[in-house]
Amino acid sequence: MSGKKIVSKTTTVGIVVGDYVVLAADKRATAGSLVAHKRVKKIIRIDDYIAMTISGLVADAEIIAEQARFIARKYKLELGRPIKVSALASNLSIILNAYLRMSPYIVQLLLGGYDDNGPHLFYIDLFGSLSEEKYMATGSGSPTAFGVLEEEYRSDLSLDEAKELAFKAVSAATKRDGFSGEGVDIVVIGPNTYVEETKLFKRSIIAK
């Protein structure tokens, strides 16, 4: 696989509940039909209280993540305060759209974070289209995961319930999607909060 970009066919989920954003992603990357890495982090910390999930070409996603970090750092240095989640989302949308006709970045992004205006979750596709959502799923397993979210999401979910729902959505996608698997990384972002945890699948979950 030397010289080839690894394609991350995956499932990522984002949920807004109360003052928090919950992001979740499976832990496997693939190249074609081959499992390239059994455990891969697909939730990238961008700023103190902002993170991004990635699906698509890993190399492209890494470039976008570095640009997001640069934008956040530059904003903080110049203005002395953290960038708003919406402002960062708009910047990433512009970047993706600008490269569309030249060499498009093959990525789908969920940008989640907390700022003075509360929790936010933005979906950004490879065309640079941008939308703010209460819940969303991306990646090869997203149809299944989104179905779970649509059926079970409520605005009054507790934080623990939201974490369980995110895990359930990714787990359901894993049962149907051979490109997602191994376990789930979960990140919770809220007021003065950035917490990472990992839940590995039991054999009964990943068994066909």
From Swiss-Prot:
Keywords recorded for this protein, A-Z: Autocatalytic cleavage, Cytoplasm, Hydrolase, Protease, Proteasome, Threonine protease, Zymogen
Alphabetized GO MF terms: threonine-type endopeptidase activity
Entry EC number(s): 3.4.25.1
Primary residence: cytoplasm
Propeptide: 1-9
Keyword Cytoplasm attached: yes
SUPFAM superfamilies named in the record: N-terminal nucleophile aminohydrolases (Ntn hydrolases)
Subcellular location: Cytoplasm
Catalytic activity: Cleavage of peptide bonds with very broad specificity
GO CC terms in record: cytoplasm; proteasome core complex, beta-subunit complex
UniProt note on regulation of activity: The formation of the proteasomal ATPase PAN-20S proteasome complex, via the docking of the C-termini of PAN into the intersubunit pockets in the alpha-rings, triggers opening of the gate for substrate entry. Interconversion between the open-gate and close-gate conformations leads to a dynamic regulation of the 20S proteasome proteolysis activity.
GO BP, sorted A to Z: proteasomal protein catabolic process
Record-annotated active site: T10
InterPro entries the UniProt entry points to: Ntn_hydrolases_N, Pept_T1A_Psome_bsu_arc, Pept_T1A_subB, Proteasome_bsu_CS, Proteasome_sua/b, Proteasome_suB-type
EC main group: hydrolase
Hydrolase in keyword set: yes
Quaternary structure annotation from Swiss-Prot or TrEMBL: The 20S proteasome core is composed of 14 alpha and 14 beta subunits that assemble into four stacked heptameric rings, resulting in a barrel-shaped structure. The two inner rings, each composed of seven catalytic beta subunits, are sandwiched by two outer rings, each composed of seven alpha subunits. The catalytic chamber with the active sites is on the inside of the barrel. Has a gated structure, the ends of the cylinder being occluded by the N-termini of the alpha-subunits. Is capped at one or both ends by the proteasome regulatory ATPase, PAN.
Family of the protein in this entry: Belongs to the peptidase T1B family.
Task of the protein: Component of the proteasome core, a large protease complex with broad specificity involved in protein degradation.
PANTHER family in the cross-refs: ATP-DEPENDENT PROTEASE SUBUNIT HSLV, METALLOPROTEASE TLDD
Name of the featured protein: Proteasome subunit beta 2
This protein's encoding gene: psmB2
